[in-house]
């Protein structure tokens, strides 16, 4: 499956380089992907997190990475499960490419025993120090017209909030291409 995704990405990426959107990445993605919204902010709302080892976890430690941030409250149910299944496919595409070392998938969950599929070196599951509802509301406020579906926040290098993918309706290749575009930013 990974080889197939890598081949698809290779064939899609070659034409993308010929007409790479560069500075127009957000504009191009908004035209291609109805479930995407550009939200270009210089910073992100602060998150008080506990890492897998129980110690404080700071987003600043990932400032050299593109972060794919998702929130998975224990009571979310099917909407979050569907989104995490789609994100697993995105991870497979990213992790079978040179982007593996440039992208971190950060999952914030208050579930007692969160299990989000296969593990990889760039998947980090953290817990909020406060009720998970608080950071979800702070990040949802970045896109007040978004539906009630869970949101995936894409944070560019330097902790710049770049965009939001809504629910599980986006095409995985579009998220992969968007993340790829952000890894190529200088």
Regions found by a protein language model. Give the residues of each.
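Thiol-/selenol-based redox modules, centered on thioredoxin-like
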Residues: 146-186
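Short loop/turn microsegments at loop-to-beta-strand junctions
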Residues: 44-45, 67, 149-151
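N-terminal targeting signals for export/organelle localization
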Residues: 1-50, 185-186
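Short active-site neighborhood of thiol/selenol oxidoreductases, capturing the structured segment around
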Residues: 57-87
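Structural micro-motif
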Residues: 121-123, 133, 137-153
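Solvent-exposed coil/turn segments that connect beta secondary-structure elements
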Residues: 62-64, 73-74, 108-112, 128-130, ...
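Structural microenvironment flanking redox-active thiols in thiol-disulfide oxidoreductases
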Residues: 82-135
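Sec/Tat-exported extracytoplasmic proteins
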Residues: 66, 72, 91-98, 136-143, ...
């Amino acid at each position: 499956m990974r080889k197939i995704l890598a081949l698809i990405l290779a064939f899609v990426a070659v034409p993308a380089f010929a007409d790479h959107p560069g500075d127009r990445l957000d504009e191009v993605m908004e035209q291609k992907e109805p479930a995407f919204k550009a939200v270009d902010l210089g910073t992100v709302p602060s998150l008080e997190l506990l890492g897998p080892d129980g110690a404080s976890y700071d987003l600043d430690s990932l400032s050299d990475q593109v972060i794919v941030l998702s929130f998975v409250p224990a009571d979310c149910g099917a909407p979050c499960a569907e989104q995490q299944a789609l994100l697993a496919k995105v991870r497979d595409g990213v992790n079978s490419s040179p982007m593996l070392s440039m992208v971190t998938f950060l999952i914030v969950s208050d579930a007692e025993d969160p299990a989000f599929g296969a593990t990889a070196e760039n998947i980090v599951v953290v817990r909020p120090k406060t009720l998970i509802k608080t950071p979800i509301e702070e990040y949802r406020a970045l896109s007040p017209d978004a539906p009630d579906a869970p949101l995936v926040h894409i944070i560019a290098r330097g902790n710049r909030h770049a965009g939001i993918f809504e629910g599980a309706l986006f095409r995985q290749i579009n998220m992969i291409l968007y993340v790829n575009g952000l890894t190529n930013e200088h």
